[in-house]
Every structure is written in C-alpha cells, then in structure tokens.
Amino acid sequence: MVLTRVIRAVGRSTLLETGVAGSGGGQLQLVRLPLRRKYTYRSGALKPMPEITPFGLFGIIATVIPGLLIGATISKNMANFLEENDLFVPSDDDDDDD
C-alpha cells in the first residue's frame, strides 16, 4: 500500500503541465521529465538495501582527535613563525581595555 503511494507520487511529480502561449484555447501539454529513481528500477522492482558501514563512536573519535591535534600543531607553528620574524608580537599592554 505504501509502495503504491510512492509510485503514484513519483509519477505525478515527473509530469509538467505547460501551456502554449500563442493559442487562445489554453491547451495544456504534459511533458514527461527525466526521473532519477531512488528506490525502484524501471521495471518497478525494488532496489536492494545499500550496504551500511558502521563507524560509531570509535570512528568519530578516530577522525576528530587527529584533526584537533593537527590543527593545534599548525597554529602553534604559525604563531612561533610570526613571533620569530617580528611580524606579530603580542604585548601585555594591549590586554588592558580600560
């Protein structure tokens, strides 16, 4: 029942009504738009479920922690470079906004 609703909704969404501007009768033409089907083949058969690769909490930790460490290392090296070449030297007097 749900599948028939999906197929009907997909069929309706691919039809485009266009009116002919030159004709006074206002005839409508149905133009079928190309459709990229997500769930079904052209024959109507359902596509198989995609393979899901579970990463979980370990995958998140394995990507976030190295990213933070690499970013911190790069920023530390850039701050040292700027200070060594006297391009930016922080002073203690700038901290007071009185």
From Swiss-Prot:
GO cellular component assignments: uniplex complex
Pfam families noted in UniProt: DDDD (PF10161)
Localization annotation: Mitochondrion inner membrane
Transmembrane segments: 52-72
One of the GO BP terms on file: calcium import into the mitochondrion
Keyword tRNA processing: no
Cross-referenced InterPro entries: MCU_reg
Keywords for the protein's UniProt record, in alphabetical order: Calcium, Calcium transport, Ion transport, Membrane, Mitochondrion, Mitochondrion inner membrane, Transit peptide, Transmembrane, Transmembrane helix, Transport
Membrane-protein topology: Single-pass membrane protein
PANTHER family: ESSENTIAL MCU REGULATOR, MITOCHONDRIAL
Protein function: Essential regulatory subunit of the mitochondrial calcium uniporter (mcu) channel, a protein that mediates calcium uptake into mitochondria.
Similarity annotation: Belongs to the SMDT1/EMRE family.
Protein name: Essential MCU regulator, mitochondrial
